């Protein structure tokens, strides 16, 4: 995108893929679960891992970007892009190759003995669902509101909304949070 925008290129392919399913198969966790005797006393350990098994999925996409509109067929115009991070404000939410301590610090795998790698589920992908639950809607809407204000975009200008939600569980909460911030996009425009 930036290469085309700067005039350096006329065409570019932008692609991305994610294949988390290989991490999420239950058999990848079997030996760890056998070692987690405290699982009955601390079911949150299983939830931190299982939550992701149902929320993440494989996906891929590619776009051909060009410096001029397509002469035949549909063309989409990129008018602007924004990206926001809250890593400077919030604790780590998703992690692998370590474990999260009570104070929020991430202890890396290299600080564990090799015997503890499986015992402590160090290499499993985990998510701090409390951090997620407390912040996902608020920060998602905050970034949307900032982008809309910066680019003077009103809700009336939105024909379709493709929100980044992993589950319908988040849709009503996101809609409500948008409404609180003055972003009124009817659900029938959501895809």
Question: Which residues does each predicted region cover?
Answer:
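Claisen-condensing/thiolase-fold acyl-transfer catalytic domains that form or cleave C-C bonds
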Residues: 1-5, 129-149, 154-155, 159-191
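A glycine- and small-aliphatic-rich helix-loop capping segment at beta-alpha/alpha-beta transitions
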Residues: 2-7, 27-40, 177-183
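Extended hydrophobic secondary-structure segments that form protein cores and membrane-embedded regions
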Residues: 13-15, 81, 160-164
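Active-site-proximal alpha-helical scaffold in enzymes
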Residues: 1-18, 63-69
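Condensing-enzyme catalytic core mediating Claisen C-C bond formation in acyl metabolism
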Residues: 41-138, 142
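Short, active-site-adjacent cap segments at secondary-structure transitions
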Residues: 20-22, 168-169
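Short acidic, glycine/serine/threonine-rich loops at helix termini
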Residues: 23-29, 90-92
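Acidic, glycine-rich active-site loops and adjacent beta-strand->loop/helix elements
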Residues: 16-21, 84-86
